[in-house]
Amino acid sequence: MNFEQYESAYPPRALPPGAWVTRIGPSPTGKAHIGTALQAVINRSLADGSGGAFLLRIEDTDRERFVEGAIEDLLAALDWLGIRPDESVAHGGAYGPYVQSERLPIYQAAARQLVEVGHAYYCFCTPERLESVRMAQQAAGKPTMYDRHCRNLGREEVEKRLATGEKAVVRLKVPDGTEIAFDDLARGRIAFESQTIDDSVLLKSDGFPTYHLAVVVDDHLMRVNQIIRGEEWIPSTPKHVLLYQYFGWPMPRIAHTPILRDMSRRKLSKRSGDTSITGYRVQGYLPEGLRNFLTRIIWPHPEGKDVYDHEEFVRLFKAEDLPNTGPIVDPQLLDFINGQYLRRLSSAELYTATVEYLKFLLGLHQDIIFETYHPSAPIKQTLTRAELGSFYSAFTANPTYTERVLTLEPERYKRLSDIVVSTGFFFPALFTPADPKLLAKPLGSPEKAGALLGEYLRLYRPDAAQAEWEQSVRELAHEAGVKDGKLFMTLRVAVTGREQTPPLFEVLTILGGDEVQRRLELAAAMPVSL
């Protein structure tokens, strides 16, 4: 088939004027990155806000970098984020296939058409020759570009060499002495001189296209009319401008998003931790919180809000609002925003969300490392899969009890992982008595701690009101000649095994008299020698 025949299978879309057809085109080279999530949120929102359509296209033409399972990871990550494409390999659609490796005949026909009209040419240069040219250019301090050795081969010679089976690629024919420019919706006019643009490969010798050919052909056939992609593609855009001109197609509106940066303003990378979408899910972020954060770092709300309903972003955001400088992925801002979404949940909803989160973690079949941001280095805490399993069993054994636990100072929770690492002491099966040194720390000696705990046990009344309970502890401290706060801390450590917890009286109330007494007896009976 020639290209016109393929093109006839992709008619214009029946959409209202001003409707944007957007897309993302990730490559399946590993776990889906948080940058892909940002692109998906932006493009989905622009389509929704205009009554358009949002497509997910898998750009898998670089077979050497293809990672098995990456497509499935991407689909699961977007589904968790609540970003559903209108068309994709999973959702179908009238403009597929949505995987580039399934569209090879289309690209091959497009490349042949470009050659036939003189806008591209066959190149027979071997890898060895290309490497020799590259090294010579580097030695001379020149840009490394193809030297156009095959650009002016005669038609007869080309056909003869192809007929003998000689391997060839198809290269873009870049014009000489021309300015190639485009209007970026967020950055304004960007121009390149044609002598700085390489005669790039469009079709490889194995029949697979490069990004340049595939993305232009697909965006045209799928009727994409607004492209939002990362700024790393700005140097490639003049090649795409030429291709649109050579094919005689209108070029979509285009804007480039800046690269995400870490707190040191370096490009976000693995040194910043796990930057995959799944990695953020592991850390306990809600999809709503992560979506809000991603929109917040690229768009200032008109009223200066950090937290807002996503519908506001969809209604107000335009591609022209995109920033030119790299957004900072600030973990503290993300924690703040996510914490606000957690506080919107009732205790029952928070319980359900935590249970689903635990099921997800257990389904990974691995130990989990929770990370908390610190300027010098992340604070890490590891839970084995066995420990997670034990926590899940205890957490779900009595939902009514667990929901009472979750009502205590919900503002402490910034992520669902905070619940996992901070509430274990509430469950008898998970409680571990404090280290004797920690128990002795407030009062200065294990003997004094043991004696006062024993005395407190004789006074302890589970049914006492808070004021009465506090007064009894203060009187005991006064009689023993110690500060109130030190005795309260000793009781806290004895009952919870920790120095930091929600208000102690509320903890005692939830645990119940029998469990509190059991723990106090354990603490009072600890060896006095350390």
UniProtKB/Swiss-Prot annotation:
Q: Does the keyword Aminoacyl-tRNA synthetase apply?
A: yes
Give the residue interval(s) assigned to the motif 'HIGH' region.
26-36
* Motif 'KMSKS' region: chain residues: 267-271
GO cellular component annotations of the record:
cytosol
Q: What is its main location?
A: cytoplasm
- Full protein name: Glutamate--tRNA ligase
The residues that the entry says bind ATP are K270
What is this protein's function? Catalyzes the attachment of glutamate to tRNA(Glu) in a two-step reaction: glutamate is first activated by ATP to form Glu-AMP and then transferred to the acceptor end of tRNA(Glu).
Oligomer and partners: Monomer.
A GO BP term here is:
glutamyl-tRNA aminoacylation
Leading EC class: ligase
Q: What is its EC number?
A: 6.1.1.17
Q: Which Pfam families match?
A: Anticodon_2 (PF19269), tRNA-synt_1c (PF00749)
According to UniProt, the reaction catalysed is: tRNA(Glu) + L-glutamate + ATP = L-glutamyl-tRNA(Glu) + AMP + diphosphate
Q: Is this entry keyworded Aminoacyl-tRNA synthetase?
A: yes
| UniProt KW keywords | Aminoacyl-tRNA synthetase, ATP-binding, Cytoplasm, Ligase, Nucleotide-binding, Protein biosynthesis
**Which compartment or compartments is the protein found in?**
Cytoplasm
Q: Which family does it belong to?
A: Belongs to the class-I aminoacyl-tRNA synthetase family. Glutamate--tRNA ligase type 1 subfamily.
Q: Which GO terms describe its molecular function?
A: ATP binding; glutamate-tRNA ligase activity; tRNA binding; zinc ion binding
Highest taxon of the lineage: Bacteria
